[in-house]
Amino acid sequence: GANIGTITLACANAVGIKGKIISFEPHPKIFQYLKGNIDLNNQKNIEIHNLALSNKNGFSYFSDVVSDGQNKILKNTHGIKIVTKRLDDFNLFEHPISLLKIDVEGFELFVFQGGEKTLKIINCIFFECVERLYKNYEYSFSNLFDFLIENNFKIFKYYENTIQQIFKSSKLLPSQNLLAIKDIDDFLKRTNYVLAS
């Protein structure tokens, strides 16, 4: 989720008026903070949605803890009732998407499943990898890895200005941000990163 918009605002500044940022935040109270921050910064190139991305359209329940960065989709009916929608139903197919940034507290696989058509026009995904959070939803990094590979991505860890490809058997940190990239040459050209051998 976009939370209060720290990354959303930074990305909006980076792409400028010719670019567009689309952000999603399911928690109604946090969504109001997001909206307020966008208004306060007078950003016109941001579109926001008060819902959770999922692999199905409907409703779900969302936690409401004080540490709002830890809120997540619940498997039970406790919490705040929220709308869920598939990424594919936003019909974002007119223009290529340079970057999909995703941090949904372990719900990543379901977001990707609901956006399988959209993934065809995305070159790069920045996502949080936390195996213990995936277990809350009864899948593993191995399942996520396979799904991304089947959709023509290669997975990389990064440090400083270097990316290094990882494999299903690679040892990862307990919590780590990763990149899923289709066109490596384009990514390296646009970012000035280098590829580790």
Residue ranges and their predicted role:
Residues 2-197:
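Phosphate/nucleotide-binding beta-alpha loop and adjacent structural elements of enzyme active sites
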